[in-house]
Swiss-Prot record:
Changing residue 67 to R: Complete loss of interaction with HDAC1 and transformation ability. A motif (Nuclear export signal) lies at residues 76-84. Changing residue 91 to G: Complete loss of interaction with HDAC1 and transformation ability. It comes from the Viruses. InterPro entries: Papilloma_E7 (IPR000148). One of its GO terms (molecular function) is DNA binding. Residues 1-40 are annotated as: E7 terminal domain. Homodimer. Homooligomer. Interacts with host RB1; this interaction induces dissociation of RB1-E2F1 complex thereby disrupting RB1 activity. Interacts with host EP300; this interaction represses EP300 transcriptional activity. Forms a complex with CHD4 and HDAC1, thereby altering the action of host histone deacetylation. A similar complex involving E7, CHD4 and HDAC2 may also form. Interacts with protein E2; this interaction inhibits E7 oncogenic activity. GO terms for cellular component: host cell cytoplasm; host cell nucleus. This is Protein E7. GO terms for biological process: DNA-templated transcription; positive regulation of actin filament polymerization; symbiont-mediated perturbation of host cell cycle G1/S transition checkpoint; symbiont-mediated perturbation of host cell cycle progression; symbiont-mediated perturbation of host transcription; symbiont-mediated suppression of host apoptosis; symbiont-mediated suppression of host cGAS-STING signal transduction; symbiont-mediated suppression of host JAK-STAT cascade via inhibition of host IRF9 activity.
Length: 98
């Protein structure tokens, strides 16, 4: 702006409308254990995988075992259900014993 009073042509901007994709590809956590499929711009999106540290005990000698796994959120819940049930993990020493 030049001068003491603004003029209209100084405020006229040369703006062009832009096209924007308004579809949200965000996946929300569902309270059920079913995994929903996401349709993304390139088809179906891969579920996010993360690293999980698991600390458990040997089912024979009760020594502490540490595991690091890479899994989806749904699959790690399945593993948790198995570990809380009848599935037991054996340490390397106990696995050598008959």
């Amino acid at each position: 702006m030049h001068g003491d009073t603004p003029t209209l042509h100084e405020y006229m901007l040369d703006l062009q409308p832009e096209t924007t994709d308004l579809y949200c590809y965000e996946q929300l956590n569902d309270s059920s254990e079913e995994e929903d499929e996401i349709d993304g711009p390139a088809g179906q999106a891969e579920p996010d995988r993360a690293h999980y540290n698991i600390v458990t005990f040997c089912c024979k000698c009760d020594s502490t075992l540490r595991l690091c796994v890479q899994s989806t959120h749904v699959d790690i819940r399945t593993l948790e259900d198995l570990l809380m049930g009848t599935l037991g993990i054996v340490c390397p020493i106990c696995s050598q014993k008959p």
